[in-house]
Design a protein with these regions (language model features):
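Short SAM/SAH-binding signature in class I
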Residues: 86-94
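Conserved SAM/SAH-binding beta-strand->alpha-helix loop
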Residues: 51-53
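Conserved SAM-binding loop of SAM-dependent methyltransferases across substrates and taxa
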Residues: 29-42
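Class I S-adenosyl-L-methionine
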Residues: 2-7, 80-81, 86, 98-221
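Conserved class I S-adenosyl-L-methionine
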Residues: 19-28
Length: 221
């Protein structure tokens, strides 16, 4: 039986390009790994996790889905389980923004021309991940807002270009989510957090001014 994906993982699956090898890093119980493998659209599917327990669950998931022979499971830390160039897309779902960029930083071959597409679903700090990606030479190819279990998530795809960008606070807050019908709801959720964040920003700064404008609703997300 094929597992059911929530909105986050469904959106992530749609950003994996058909016909190319893919790795699901931090695969947990292997739901996304199983769906990708069962589709038959990818020449190689790798699921990896740091912990033996979840990886054993992932093996069961693949078996129940009838696609155990179409995916390879690996035990290891982050991208250390992969060889440079082994896959064209890397999925990093369900970890924090900081953990996401720390995983990327430990694999220099990812931050290179012709490197893999990164599909990311940060559990927290969406704005910080966008800023990190832009400041480290990555371009956002997709930035889709989705709701799952009553929470908003941003499902991002990024590719290394080497072009460093210094983004504004507003760009980091909303990214490209305004391109989607769900963008209005995501923007409202992001704005709702601003009053608390504003407390830690000194008055008179450009950041304070931009935050105040957003809080007052003078700018739309």
């Amino acid at each position: 039986m094929l597992p059911t994906l929530d909105a986050r993982l469904s959106a992530a699956a749609e950003l994996v390009r058909p016909g190319e090898p893919v790795a699901d890093i931090g695969c947990d119980h292997g739901k996304l790994t199983a769906v990708l493998a069962a589709s038959g659209r990818y020449p190689k599917v790798i699921g990896a996790d740091l912990r033996p327990g979840p990886l054993a669950k992932a093996e069961q998931t693949l078996e129940y889905a009838g696609c155990k022979d179409r995916a390879e499971l690996r035990l290891g830390d982050g991208l250390s389980v992969l060889s440079p160039g082994e896959v064209s897309t890397i999925v990093l779902a369900g970890v924090s923004a900081q953990t996401t960029w720390e995983i990327i930083e430990k694999a220099p071959w990812v931050s290179a021309q012709g490197g893999p597409r990164l599909v990311m679903v940060p559990a927290t700090r969406h704005s910080d991940l966008r800023r990190w990606l832009w400041e480290h030479g990555f371009a956002l190819a997709a930035d889709r807002p989705v709701q799952a279990a009553g929470r908003w998530y941003a499902v991002m795809a990024a590719e290394y270009t080497g072009k460093v960008k210094t983004p504004t606070f507003r760009e980091c807050l909303f990214g490209l989510t305004g391109q989607w019908p769900e963008g209005e709801g995501y923007a409202a959720w992001q704005k709702a957090k601003l009053p608390r964040l504003r407390l830690g920003v000194p008055d008179g700064t450009e950041l304070a001014k931009e935050m105040d404008e957003l809080i007052k609703g003078e700018s739309k997300g």
